[in-house]
């Protein structure tokens, strides 16, 4: 599965240049045009009122993207939640629970005090948010309106954050935040399946604020299109590693001089591996799994075999993967989770939008 995902990304990015690859991309292009038309029609049905848009009793902030893959939605949600909680707000995150086993069931993952679902049930991203941010409430369910109503009935939130909500048009939002990866904001500019766009670039007009993620401080984002919305730059910052199953966070220098194995089941595992090396780790072996991969006997055995073959003395992975490894830690030996934060380089832009919503 991971190999297929990698091939598809390389195909639409233009890195696959064989004749067969070019023919495949040409074959997919008409389907891409049809998909774009369908997305425009879908958007129009909600905008016209033909499909109902439901409204919760408390304000909703949506965080999402228009490009498939990792733009940093989860760490951005975490940063927003902390900003709101620092202002005394009771925050509830509404998530689909992608990759979890609940199959559409509405479930409270955290009531702000205790965890009430496992990572396998809730999905890795909702569970990570619930486990890593004290007092944050998290509810999962395919129907985010029903999930929000459950939260209103039982948790009494002041405000909601809708995780990966840009395309969830059936729920009204009071602030629509769109994330774009500064390295490649729109991929090859085509919609699925000939590109990575989940909907046409014209969807930018629905955003109230655009956040460019993975920015390098001082470098202006390059979108290639005019954006008449407030813009914030954000950087991804790795702050250190935490030993599993838990313990004091350590700087990356803690692993200096040791040879490590890195694995990840995220949208862009190669970026994670590169980041580990940039932090000074000596990574001698890597293993990529599909995004939101579940970890069972086969996956753990593959990691253990590679660790033994490479003679790595420790393993490092992402926080998102780490929450799914509790049953296997004794077999993996020394293992660490790299801690990632999103920091707003133009925080005032975001805060102004939040305060406009909170105090209107």
Curated annotation (Swiss-Prot):
| UniProt EC number | 2.7.1.130
Quick one: which residues bind ATP? 67-74
The cellular component terms of Gene Ontology attached to this UniProt record, alphabetical and capped at eight, are: plasma membrane
Pfam families listed in its UniProt record:
LpxK
Q: Which UniProt keywords apply?
A: ATP-binding, Kinase, Lipid A biosynthesis, Lipid biosynthesis, Lipid metabolism, Nucleotide-binding, Transferase
GO MF terms listed in the record are: ATP binding; tetraacyldisaccharide 4'-kinase activity
**Protein's recorded name:** Tetraacyldisaccharide 4'-kinase
In which organism is this protein found? Answer: Geotalea uraniireducens (strain Rf4)
> Taxonomy-wise, where does this protein's organism fall, top ranks first?
Bacteria, Pseudomonadati, Thermodesulfobacteriota, Desulfuromonadia, Geobacterales
């Amino acid at each position: 599965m991971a190999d297929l995902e990698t091939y598809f990304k390389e195909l639409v990015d233009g890195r696959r240049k064989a004749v067969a690859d070019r023919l495949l991309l040409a074959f997919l292009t008409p389907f891409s045009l049809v998909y774009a038309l369908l997305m425009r029609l879908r958007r129009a049905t909600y905008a016209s009122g033909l499909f109902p848009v439901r409204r919760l009793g408390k304000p909703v902030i949506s965080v999402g993207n228009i490009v498939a893959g990792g733009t940093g939605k989860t760490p951005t949600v975490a940063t927003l939640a902390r900003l709101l909680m620092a202002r005394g707000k009771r925050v509830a995150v509404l998530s689909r629970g992608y990759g979890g086993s609940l199959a559409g069931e509405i479930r409270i993952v955290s009531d702000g005090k205790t965890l009430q679902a496992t990572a396998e049930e809730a999905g890795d991203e909702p569970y990570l948010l619930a486990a890593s941010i004290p007092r944050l409430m998290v509810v999962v369910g395919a129907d985010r309106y029903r999930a929000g109503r459950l939260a209103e009935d039982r948790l009494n939130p002041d405000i909601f954050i809708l995780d990966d909500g840009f395309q969830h048009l059936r729920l009204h939002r009071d602030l629509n935040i769109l994330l774009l990866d500064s390295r490649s904001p729109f991929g090859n500019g085509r919609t699925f399946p000939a590109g990575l766009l989940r909907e046409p670039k014209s969807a930018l007009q629905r955003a109230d604020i655009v956040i460019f993620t993975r920015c390098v401080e001082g470098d202006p984002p390059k979108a290639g299109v005019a954006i008449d919305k407030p813009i914030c730059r954000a950087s991804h910052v790795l702050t250190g590693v935490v030993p599993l199953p838990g313990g004091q966070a350590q700087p990356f220098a803690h692993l200096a001089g040791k040879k490590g194995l890195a694995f990840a089941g995220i949208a862009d595992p190669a970026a994670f591996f590169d980041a580990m090396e940039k932090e000074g780790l000596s990574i001698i072996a890597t293993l990529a799994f599909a995004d939101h991969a579940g970890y069972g006997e086969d996956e753990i055995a593959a990691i253990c075999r590679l660790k033994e073959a490479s003679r790595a003395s420790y393993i490092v992975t992402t926080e998102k993967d780490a929450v799914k490894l509790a049953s296997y830690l004794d077999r993996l030996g020394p293992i660490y989770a790299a801690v990632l934060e999103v920091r707003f380089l133009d925080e005032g832009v975001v805060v102004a939008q939040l305060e406009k919503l909170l105090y209107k």
